[in-house]
Each structure stands twice: as structure tokens, then as C-alpha cells.
């Protein structure tokens, strides 16, 4: 049961009432307002506060910024058929007018605006349980900090706004360091208060927990090379003793794995409420439009766990490759996936709107058996933080601090030895440099298409890995009979002096006279 439906119409109605405009209204509101609701009347009860905080959750990362964000890195390709600005980012052709980055910027700042409204008004409520109101306050503070973490990771320098603004107010850009310090301070205050519970009952699944605050602190710390903070926060999550790896890697991203003990924080979709097309990002043969395509960069990250077969490059690969990617020869629905140029199926590589361009298709997040009768009713939650990530952050922090001990190997090997994965363990005796490479590769193998690859490449200063010829699937060329790698001559660029920080959107520059554009971009 999943009752925190963060995209339902009532949530957006709250936003429309108090921020001057609606972000879009779904059908089927929980209430029918009979007239305008005054601010004085609204901030009266505990239920008012809960609805307002629910509105803050509404701006959490969705399928776009979880699945699609990996499509602008070395491991993926975001189809240009309906949102060409995503592909522009992938190719290194980014500018302040890019619609993709503008949309992400606006969503995070909507969340911040809503959180600021909660924090400015919640103390006015007299009719409510003090403990519940304190928890709701902590939730709003956490979500605001989460949005600022994302903004600082993508744009680096952004305005820090902590109170409701008048329409004419303008705020200058704050440095990335100021934003990061604010986020860590906020998370520390929330963690130290112990207001957030370790878990919730079924009526409140999806709300922020104490563990989520600790895990988010580890994430913001490791993104900014604060390895001692990251180590300690990750260890604190581990020591809670309430999280564990879900046995089925593939099942974790399907209906069976929802709300499992591996999930620390996610964007919830409610049964009978807000949904999305569960097949939409995947193959044409099951009704998808190949929105995000895995690329050769991902294939190359997965190890061979048995002899490499020159007659079949897919044989003996890490099982997570099979769980994450549809490639020719794999079952798909009631058929066999075949995207080779000679295929007579809808999945044949093509420049059409629905077919894959480079040959591979996304399998992660696709739950065929559950949604085969109506994929539009997909309600698989978008996992934002999970325990495997915490283990890898712990291991990486210890490696960077040169505190290499058995616990580092244990953390990595727990993931590699997950039932249904069971790839060989990493044996002890590795150097710091060797372990650094191991944990970085393990992150992409484990966390592919969970919206983390771009952040990892940026914090490691490895943006150049996105550079070069875009390469898709292995296939047998009909004329030569040899295995080939598909490409169309598309080349991605990366400017290390500019592209680690996205440009402030042009729309923002046009209305804010005191904001400063990031270096390297012209308006």
C-alpha cells in the first residue's frame, strides 16, 4: 500500500493557492473548493500543514531526472525524437536557453518555494499535535536541503533563498561552497533533533526518515570530497541495522521490490492515483519509444565472469547487464528482442520515433508481467537513495582516506554477492589506486539508470569520459559476417573549463538583474 501520492491533484492545488500559479492539475481532487481560501484560514490545522508539505514532495526527482539523466552520460543516449534539448546536453552543445536544464531548475526551485512557505507559516498552527508538526517541519527542511544539494551539484553556484519572496525580489548567486555548507548544516540539525522516525506505517510510506537524512548527508559530503563526513554518515546508516540488500536485483525495480528494506528514500506513486507508462522508456515492441538507450560505454563496464567468447560478446557477462538492458536474443514480453538491422520486428534500429537508434533498450524499471495489460498504470516508485549506494559511499570514502581494511572489501563484496548477482568477490591486498577504480566501476554497474552517473563523473572530474564517438550495440554485419559496433558518426564534446557546471537558465537571467552566469556561457 502506498498512500503518499506526491503527484495527486490536491498537492498541486495547494501550490496553486499559495504560490500564485498551478504546476498542472490532475483529475480527481480529494476536495472541491467552493471559493478562494484565505491564507489565515488555511494555516489552521495539522491537516493543512500535512497537505502543504505534500506539495513540497511533489517536486522530487521523477522519471526524467532519474532515468533520463543517465542518458546524457557515457552510459546512455537520450532519444532526440521528442526532447532534443536532452540530446544537446549529451553531445556537449549546452547553452542557457536549453529547455531541459530550464525545466529541472524550475522544478527544484518550485520545491524550495513551497518549503519556504511551509517553514514561514507552520508555527501559526495551533490545532495540531506538536510532535507531528515538528516532524512536518523537519520534512520540509530536508526536502529544501535535498533540492539545494541537486542544484549545487548541477549548477554549482545558485541563489540561496530561505524565505518566501515578493514577486519583485531578486537574489544574487551564492557560491557552491555556501550552498553545500547550508545543506550539511540543515541535515545535521535534522539528524541531531531525532524528530524524523526510522520508519512509517503504510499510511505514510515515502516520507523522509532519519535514515534518509543520514544517507543524504553522506551523498552531499562525498560529492564534495568531504570524505570523513561521508564515511561517518554512511556508517551511521549501516549501524541503524534496518536496511539490507534485496535478494533480487531485477525485482528491486519492479512491483515486488517496492518499499523493501533496501529502499531508503524514493518518489512514491500511489495505486489508483498518479501513474506513468511503465514501458514508455523501453522498446517499441512492448509499446515504448526507446526514450533512453543504454550504450557501449555501459556494456564495457560490466565484467566477464567466465571465458570471453569471440563468437558471442554477450556470453558470461555480469548478470546485472542482463537485468538492466534489452539486447538481441533476450526475451521481451512474449517475444525475443531483436534490434539488428536485419530484424523484422518493431525493435529494429531505425530513426523512427519509437525504435531504438543505437540498438539497446532499457530493461531496468520495466515490469512486464505486472503491467502488460495496461502499462499506463505503472506505479513503480523511483528509488532516490538505496542501501547499496550507502555501502559504496562508505567503501569509497574509506578508500579516499586510505583507511583500507576488511570493511571496505565487505561493503563492495556484499553487493557483488547479492543473490541473483553473485559475481566473484574482490580479494584483499589491492592498492588504493586499484580499489578506487574498482569502486568507481562498481557504482556504474550497480546504479546504472538511477540518475547518479552524471554526478559521479562530475565529482571525479571525469567528464571527458563522455567525449568521443557515440557507440551502440554489438551486432553481426550481414555483409562481412563479423561482429561490429553500431555508430552513426555522432561525436560528443566536453569542455572541462565550463561543462562541470550547467548554465543558469536564460529565463532566470532575463528576470534577475543581480544573478551571475556561470563561467563560459554567454547569454
Residue ranges of predicted features:
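An aromatic- and glycine-enriched ligand-binding surface/loop that stacks and positions planar moieties
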Residues: 22-84, 180, 188-189, 193-194, ...
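Long, intrinsically disordered, low-complexity segments
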Residues: 21-23, 65, 83, 95, ...
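Alpha-helical solenoid repeat scaffolds, predominantly canonical TPR units
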Residues: 114, 179, 186, 233, ...
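C-terminal substrate/ligand-recognition segments
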Residues: 325-415
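Bacterial Sec-dependent N-terminal signal peptides
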Residues: 1-33
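Conserved, well-structured interaction surfaces
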Residues: 45-54, 58-64, 84-155, 169-178, ...
Amino acid at each position: 500500500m502506498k498512500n503518499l501520492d506526491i503527484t495527486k491533484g490536491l498537492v498541486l492545488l495547494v501550490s496553486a493557492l499559495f504560490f500564485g500559479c498551478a504546476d498542472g492539475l490532475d483529475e480527481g481532487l480529494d476536495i472541491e473548493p467552493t471559493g478562494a481560501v484565505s491564507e489565515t484560514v488555511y494555516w489552521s490545522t495539522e491537516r493543512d500543514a500535512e497537505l502543504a508539505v505534500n506539495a513540497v514532495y511533489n517536486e522530487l526527482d521523477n522519471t526524467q531526472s532519474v532515468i533520463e539523466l543517465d542518458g546524457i552520460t557515457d552510459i546512455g543516449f537520450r532519444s532526440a525524437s521528442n526532447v532534443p534539448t536532452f540530446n544537446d546536453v549529451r553531445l556537449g552543445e549546452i547553452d542557457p536557453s536549453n529547455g531541459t536544464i530550464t525545466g529541472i531548475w524550475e522544478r527544484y526551485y518550485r520545491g524550495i518555494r513551497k518549503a519556504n512557505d511551509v517553514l514561514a507559516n507552520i508555527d501559526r498552527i495551533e490545532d495540531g499535535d506538536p510532535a507531528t508538526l515538528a516532524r512536518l517541519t523537519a520534512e520540509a527542511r530536508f526536502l529544501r536541503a535535498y533540492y539545494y544539494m541537486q542544484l549545487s551539484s548541477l549548477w554549482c553556484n545558485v541563489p540561496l533563498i530561505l524565505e518566501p519572496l515578493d514577486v519583485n525580489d531578486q537574489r544574487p548567486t551564492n557560491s557552491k561552497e555556501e550552498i553545500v555548507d547550508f545543506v550539511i548544516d540543515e541535515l545535521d540539525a535534522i539528524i541531531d533533533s531525532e524528530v524524523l522516525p526510522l520508519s512509517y506505517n503504510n499510511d505514510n510510506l515515502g516520507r523522509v526518515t532519519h535514515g534518509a537524512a543520514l544517507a543524504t548527508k553522506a551523498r552531499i559530503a562525498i560529492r564534495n570530497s568531504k570524505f570523513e563526513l561521508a564515511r561517518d554518515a554512511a556508517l551511521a546508516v549501516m549501524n541503524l541495522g534496518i536496511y539490507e540488500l534485496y535478494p533480487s536485483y531485477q525485482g528491486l525495480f519492479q512491483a515486488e521490490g517496492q518499499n523493501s528494506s533496501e529502499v531508503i528514500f524514493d518518489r512514491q506513486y500511489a495505486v489508483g492515483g498518479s501513474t506513468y507508462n511503465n514501458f514508455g522508456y523501453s522498446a517499441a515492441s512492448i509499446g515504448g519509444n526507446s526514450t533512453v538507450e543504454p550504450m557501449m560505454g555501459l556494456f564495457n563496464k560490466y565484467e566477464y565472469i567466465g571465458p570471453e567468447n569471440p563468437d558471442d560478446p554477450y556470453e558470461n557477462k555480469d548478470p546485472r547487464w542482463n537485468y538492466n538492458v534489452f539486447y538481441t536474443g533476450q526475451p521481451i514480453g512474449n517475444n525475443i528482442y531483436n534490434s539488428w538491422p536485419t530484424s523484422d520486428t518493431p525493435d529494429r534500429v531505425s530513426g523512427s520515433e519509437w525504435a531504438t537508434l543505437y540498438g539497446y533498450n532499457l530493461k531496468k524499471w520495466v515490469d512486464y508481467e505486472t503491467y502488460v495489460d495496461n502499462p499506463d498504470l505503472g506505479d513503480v516508485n523511483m528509488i532516490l537513495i538505496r542501501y547499496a549506494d550507502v555501502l559504496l559511499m562508505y567503501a569509497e570514502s574509506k578508500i579516499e582516506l586510505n583507511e583500507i581494511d576488511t570493511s571496505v572489501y565487505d561493503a563492495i563484496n556484499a553487493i557483488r554477492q547479492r543473490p541473483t548477482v553473485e559475481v566473484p568477490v574482490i580479494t584483499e591486498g589491492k592498492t588504493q589506486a586499484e580499489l578506487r577504480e574498482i569502486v568507481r566501476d562498481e557504482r556504474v554497474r550497480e546504479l546504472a539508470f538511477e540518475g547518479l552517473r552524471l554526478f559521479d563523473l562530475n565529482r571525479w572530474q571525469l567528464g571527458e569520459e563522455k567525449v568521443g564517438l557515440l557507440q551502440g550495440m554489438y551486432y553481426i554485419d550481414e555483409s562481412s559476417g563479423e561482429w561490429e559496433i553500431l555508430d552513426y558518426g555522432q561525436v560528443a564534446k566536453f569542455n572541462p573549463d565550463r561543462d562541470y557546471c550547467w548554465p543558469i537558465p536564460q529565463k532566470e537571467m532575463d528576470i534577475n538583474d543581480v544573478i551571475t552566469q556561470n563561467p563560459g556561457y554567454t547569454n
